[in-house]
Amino acid sequence: MINLFLFCRAGYEKDCAAEIQVRAAELDIGGFVKTNTNDAYVIFQCFQAGDAEVLAKNISLDSLIFARQMFAAKELLKGLPEQDRISPIVEALAQVHKAGELRVETPDTNEAKELSNFCRKFTVPLRQALKKSGALLEKENPKRPIIHVCFVASGQAYVGFSLSNNSSPYFMGIPRLKIAADAPSRSTLKLDEAFIHFIPKEEQETRLSSGMKAVDLGACPGGWTYQLVRRGMFVAAVDNGPMDQGLMDTGQVKHYQADGFRFEPPRKNITWLVCDMIEKPSRVAELIEAWAINGWFKESIFNLKLPMKARYKEVSTILATMEEILKENGVDDFSIAAKHLYHDRDEVTVHLCLRPSQPW
């Protein structure tokens, strides 16, 4: 296959494109990007046939900031006949054998989502045809490749596959989370998604456990504090603004009316530091660096608000600088990762884990 198809948020195509160009170059794979503003996807077309599979295998999806999902794809199938869309798709997937799952998807745009009802109905007969051809196993198998059929317009689709160990578990790379009725704000979904994304499911019980101490900088009205409280943590909520009364009534929250940039925790036995403040990203990064150098927390999740242009370059520079500063100050054992999550807007979410080599 010659294309790498990447799902992203509409409006972030240039950032996703810039990132995949850099990552492909690191693997000495040549190609060029094809995308349009607000399409919510990017195509990286390789110069050499077969290189798309190399990218899909060797670039970790989790290491990409702006891509929600990716798969190796054939050239765009155009003009799929209404009377038989299935045959051309089955033919295009002839080189795929014994895949474990089928996903018929669209980009995350209002225009493309108008096809979602069709995609649901189309999945059933397409699945049967792919099973008959041998491209798809009779029973779903989470260890086998995933077939993707992405309709970008009526009668037009990219088809291909992703590897199950390097693929989002969600259709279109989008987790479907519901906001709780008593959550103080919709921002609560950002931290909920961040915990799901950055902390492996099998480690959540030990790394997000009841009784832990946490600090929320810029907490008002308590959207992020809510996620910490519902996991049984005790939270120092730092903000000059008011906190949600329901959270205060739990007895798990102590409200410090202070500036998050000036606050120093009275006790340093903090497991989680979280921060979602509307501030220059470099200033937030410097704040987290200071806390890390002082050894005041074990793990942190924080948001970096993005500029209007050159967002990939800005984030990359900030993360590289953070790594350099931490190492210069004796913090050597850490991991850092960033993702433009579905519930993020003009921001990216960063996870910094100190001493990740130690068992939890």
Swiss-Prot record:
Reaction(s) the record says it catalyses: cytidine(2498) in 23S rRNA + S-adenosyl-L-methionine = 2'-O-methylcytidine(2498) in 23S rRNA + S-adenosyl-L-homocysteine + H(+)
One cellular component term from this protein's GO annotations in UniProt: cytoplasm
Residues of the active site: 305 (proton acceptor)
Enzyme class, spelled out: transferase
Family: Belongs to the class I-like SAM-binding methyltransferase superfamily. RNA methyltransferase RlmE family. RlmM subfamily.
Signal peptide start and end residues: none
Protein's UniProt keywords contain Cell membrane: no
NCBIfam families: PRK11760.1 (NF008734)
Localization terms from the record: Cytoplasm
Single GO biological process annotation from the record: rRNA processing
Protein name: Ribosomal RNA large subunit methyltransferase M
EC id: 2.1.1.186
Role, per record: Catalyzes the 2'-O-methylation at nucleotide C2498 in 23S rRNA.
